[in-house]
Amino acid sequence: MTRRIGFTPRARSQFLAAVEYMHAERPMAARAFRNRSMEALRNLIRFPESGRVIPEFPDLGFREVLVGKYRFFYRLQGDAVWVVGVWHDAQIPDEPA
């Protein structure tokens, strides 16, 4: 059973940048996005394979969960879900590492 969520440094930076960007214009929307994101990630603790395989990188073993217009790329490792990237859906994502 998966018991925790972790962020790589890059993913944490991307997530915080998205929240800060929203907060500058709409603080309430930023707070709601942060809360929805954390809820979606917590759901992965119970259902770690519920995210879809990333269409751009189907052979790499990464999955994604969508929150609004943002894509959270993650991988399963031991008892953890590791978020490896956070992208707006208008961005072309880098290959997860």
Language model feature labels by segment:
Residues 67-97:
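Enriched for short, Lys/Arg-rich terminal
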Residues 1-62, 80, 94-96:
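Basic, Lys/Arg-enriched alpha-helical interface segments
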